[in-house]
Structures are given as C-alpha cells and as structure tokens.
Curated annotation (Swiss-Prot):
Record localization: Cell membrane
Alphabetic keyword roster: Adaptive immunity, Calcium, Calcium channel, Calcium transport, Cell membrane, Glycoprotein, Immunity, Ion channel, Ion transport, Membrane, Transmembrane, Transmembrane helix, Transport
InterPro entries linked: CRAC_channel, Orai_sf
Protein name per the record: Calcium release-activated calcium channel protein 1
Residues exposed to the Cytoplasmic side: 1-63, 113-145, 214-258
Recorded GO MF terms: store-operated calcium channel activity
Pfam families for the chain: Orai-1
Source organism per UniProt: Xenopus laevis
Function: Ca(2+) release-activated Ca(2+) (CRAC) channel subunit which mediates Ca(2+) influx following depletion of intracellular Ca(2+) stores.
Keyword Membrane: yes
Gene that encodes the chain: orai1
C-alpha cells in the first residue's frame, strides 16, 4: 500500500502531483477525448430512446386502431333501422360516411404498425448497442408519426362523431309522434336522448382538441430545449477542437522597442 500524501518517501507521487505535471495541451486533449466519448454514448442513447418511442407509438396505434375500427364495424352491422320511420337523408349519409372514414383511417394506421413494428421489435430484442443502426425507425419516422396521428387524433375525433351519429340513428325513432297538419311538433323521448348525448359529447370533443393542442405545443417546446442543449454541447466540442488545432503554434513573445 502507498502512504498518504505529505509523507516523505520514495513511493509513487500523489494524484495532485500528477495533475500538476500534466501540461495544458495534454489536458485539452484528454478533455476532448472524454467529451467525444460522452457524445458518442449520448448519440447512441438518443437513438435507442427514439427506437423505444417509435415502438411504443406503433403498439399504441395498433391497439387503438384495432379496437375503434372493430367497434365501428360492429355498430354499423348491428344497428337496426326502423322501416316505418322516415329518417332524415343527411343523417344516414353522415353515419355511413363517418363509419367508412373511421374504419379506413384506423386500418391505415394498423397497416403501418403491422409492417414496421416487427422490424423494430427484432432490433430491440438484440442486446447490442450498435444494433440500433439496423432499425428502420429513423427512415420511417414520418410514417410512424402519421400512423400515430391518424390513430390517436383523427381517429378519436371520428369516433366521437360516430358515437353521436349512432345515438341519433338509434334513438330518433323511439316514441316519434305522428304529426298531423293541425298539431304542433313535440320533442319525443328518443329525440331528447339524442340531443342529450350530443350536448354531452360536443364539450368533451372541444376539451379533447384543446388538450391535443396543448400537449403538442408542450412536446415541441421540450424538443426545442433539447436541441438548444445539444447545440451548446457541439459548440463546446468545436471550441476544444479549435484549441487542439492551435496548441502547436509558436507563442509570439512581445517585442520591446528602445
């Protein structure tokens, strides 16, 4: 064992003495190497975080799309129209169009998730840091974001509209009065139920839109802060590189004039 610092002996020098013996260019070189290694590890960690985020988005999109598209198909098949009731033409057209668009949007998101997710899962299960380069999540980033937006934003809004239209189609014929020319129209219990569901769903849809906009702005602000932090780290690396490039330049001594 080596004695403590301050004891006069011929043992190895203390760490403070070693630090004093290191010249300034060597210290700059070591700092640059350390920062480069940290930057490489941080880039790999960032790639792995993007991979896990893409995988989570695809899983959420596939589950949500399968659930909501299945509900829309069952709702269209199982709904029973009253043959003796005169439905408004616009109601049936809106219900059919909303159901079709809802199923198409969610099937598109489900198709993207089904095609990309197995390739990402295969890479994420390999216990190797460099295997992240084999994942297609960087190249398919726009497709993943599009599928996630279709499934969680557009698909959810269409689902809310589907619920409202389904309530009108289902409850409108209930206790509908037969109005003659001498009688005034009255709101039936079925119409009241449909109006109530619409009055509840419209504010909820507005709250959903406000939350989606607020969440998107918060996410963009967080990404912007992270970009500024990475730019500052790159500026520090560039400064250290500049100091390393000029460490061999001769220092000009001041000239004294008589």
């Amino acid at each position: 064992m080596y004695p403590e610092c301050g004891v006069e002996t011929k043992s190895r020098p203390c760490s403070k003495q070693l630090q004093e013996e290191v010249s300034y260019p060597e210290w700059i070189s070591r700092s640059y190497v350390e920062l480069m290694s940290l930057n490489e590890h941080s880039m790999q960690a960032l790639s792995w975080r993007k991979l896990y985020l893409s995988r989570a988005k695809l899983k959420a999109s596939s589950r949500t799309s399968a659930l909501l598209s299945g509900f829309a198909m069952v709702a269209m098949v199982e709904v029973q129209l009253e043959p003796n009731h005169a439905y408004p033409p616009g109601l049936l057209i809106a219900f059919s169009a909303c159901t079709t668009v809802l199923v198409a949007v969610h099937l598109f998101a489900l198709m993207v998730s089904t095609c990309i997710l197995p390739n990402i899962e295969a890479v994420s299960n390999v216990h190797n840091l460099n295997s992240v380069k084999e994942s297609p999540h960087e190249r398919m980033h726009h497709h993943i974001e599009l599928a996630w937006a279709f499934s969680t934003v557009i698909g959810t809004l269409l689902f809310l509209a589907e619920v409202v239209l389904l309530c009108w189609v289902k409850f409108l014929p209930v206790n509908s009065p037969k109005i003659s020319s001498n009688e005034t129209s009255a709101v039936s219990s079925g119409q009241a139920a449909a109006i109530t569901s619409t009055a509840i769903m419209v504010p909820f849809g507005l709250v959903f839109i406000v939350f989606a906009v607020h969440f998107y702005r918060s996410l963009v602000s967080h990404k912007t802060d992270r970009q500024f932090q990475e730019l500052n780290e790159l500026a520090e690396l560039a400064q250290l590189q500049d100091q390393l490039d000029h460490r061999g330049d001769p220092v000009q001594s001041p000239v004294h004039y008589a």
